[in-house]
């Protein structure tokens, strides 16, 4: 059975919501899917004062968890065009896995959330360098996903990966089209992982 990990960091719940949709898409293929999050780095009082959603159901991952999966789908909000520091910190702890080549040949994919759309693709690309160093086979979101080419409304996502636009104040949660793209990406990644691990 194909094993997929959806690994994310979410401050305000947008990426958490997308992670659940990505996982649903992957599960639709019959894959075993786990959802985990990376550790929060902010002191608890600072996080609470900033409105960070601390009560998330997903367990906290450890870097060694990554070796147990055929595919890892990473999710992070945009921070000035890059992944969040919490995700960067987690990936920086995978040096031992890199030295041993433990992630070579696994599928890697990325999804994101932005306030107004700026940084969507650069955030995903900020993952790609690390994933390539580890030897991941990187998978995006192809145009066979019909919602990707639909321009009837403002939405996140690109061929690099699914995304959501939260609004400058964070009040907008993922739309139906963004959810459809997330599910498509999860399904697409799981299907490719199944083919490569057969």
Swiss-Prot record:
Its cofactor is FMN. It comes from the Bacteria. One of its GO terms (molecular function) is FMN binding. NAD(+) binds at residue 12. It is an enzyme of class 1 (oxidoreductase). Its EC number is 1.6.5.2. It holds the Pfam family FMN_red. GO terms for cellular component: membrane. Binds 1 FMN per monomer. It catalyses: a quinone + NADH + H(+) = a quinol + NAD(+); a quinone + NADPH + H(+) = a quinol + NADP(+). Keywords: Flavoprotein, FMN, NAD, NADP, Nucleotide-binding, Oxidoreductase. FMN binds at residues 10-15, 78-80, 113-118, 133. InterPro entries: Flavodoxin/NO_synth, Flavoprotein-like_sf, Flavoprotein_WrbA-like, FMN_Rdtase-like_dom, NQO. The keyword Transferase does not apply. Substrate binds at residue 98. SUPFAM superfamilies: Flavoproteins (SSF52218). The keyword NADP applies. Residues 4-189 form the Flavodoxin-like domain. Belongs to the WrbA family. This is NAD(P)H dehydrogenase (quinone).
């Amino acid at each position: 059975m194909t094993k997929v990990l959806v690994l994310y960091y979410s401050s305000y719940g947008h990426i958490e919501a997308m992670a659940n949709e990505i996982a649903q898409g992957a599960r639709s293929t019959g894959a075993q899917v786990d959802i985990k999050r990376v550790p929060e780095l902010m002191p608890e009082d600072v996080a609470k004062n900033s409105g960070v959603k601390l009560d998330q159901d997903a367990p906290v991952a450890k870097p060694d968890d990554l070796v147990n999966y055929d595919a890892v789908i990473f999710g992070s909000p945009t921070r000035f065009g890059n992944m969040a520091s919490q995700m960067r910190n987690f990936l920086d702890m995978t040096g031992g896995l890199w030295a041993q080549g433990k992630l070579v040949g696994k599928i890697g994919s990325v999804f994101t959330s932005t306030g107004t759309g700026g940084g969507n693709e650069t955030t995903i690309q900020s993952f790609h360098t690390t994933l390539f160093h580890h030897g991941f086979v990187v998978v995006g979101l192809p145009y066979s996903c019909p919602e990707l080419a639909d321009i009837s409304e403002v939405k996140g996502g690109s061929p690099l990966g699914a995304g959501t636009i939260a609004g400058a104040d964070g009040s907008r949660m993922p739309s139906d089209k963004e959810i459809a793209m997330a599910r498509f990406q999860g399904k697409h990644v799981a299907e490719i992982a199944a083919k490569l691990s057969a």
